[in-house]
Amino acid sequence: MSKIFFDTETTGLKPSQIGQLAYIIQGDNNEIIGKNYYFEVEHVEDGAAAVTGMNTDFYKKASGGQRFADKANEIANDFNNKLAIAHNIEFDKNFMNIEMFRAGVPFGFDKTFDTMLFFKDICKIPGRGNYKFKNPKLIEVIQSLCIDTDKIEKYSEKIFNLHSGSFHNAMYDTASLLVLFNVYGEIYNGIYGYWRDTFVRKGAC
């Protein structure tokens, strides 16, 4: 089954609007296709702008006036019949579902995989209160596997033909998910292949 790694940058915490959607399709033959879209939005909460560095003016300029509905059919087709992979996927799913509903485009996730929940008991980062382990951040999972973040940066630039440069940019996070998933797959299967050889720091783990 083909996989689609994705991340969103949103206008707030509650399902309102998606300002950026980046995703990478990894086909059955390991072909890699990256897509990144910015969308014009009505409003960006101060908290969201502080985290991402992107406000309404940025989205208007970067999108060229394009809105989510303009690309909804293409996006829905790209997600169709694929394993969708994200970090804290329920958050992104809520935004995707509401944007597709607004656009009037039938949409659903066939199968999903949440890297945050999967790696929670692998990273074993102590939680607070009654929680044995905390939900790990994406960077914490990457660090636990000794993955080189500089190499992810360069890889994301190659895939999207752009400079991403931030953990709060959907392009970088999406490339991180792709690398993380494939590195762990090789580790789990006892394989030292392309992903471990390319992205894991030598002698670090």
Regions found by a protein language model. Name each.
Residues 80-90, 95, 99-100, 128-205:
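Acidic, Mg2+-coordinating catalytic module of metal-dependent nucleases/exonucleases
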Residues 13-15, 120, 179:
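Conserved protein kinase catalytic core
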Residues 3, 121-122, 157:
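General secondary-structure edge motif
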Residues 113-133:
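Short alpha-helix plus adjacent loop in nuclease-associated cores
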Residues 1-103, 109, 139-146:
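Conserved non-catalytic scaffold segment of RNase H-like nuclease domains
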Residues 61, 112, 154-155:
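Proline- and acidic/polar-enriched loop/turn elements at helix boundaries
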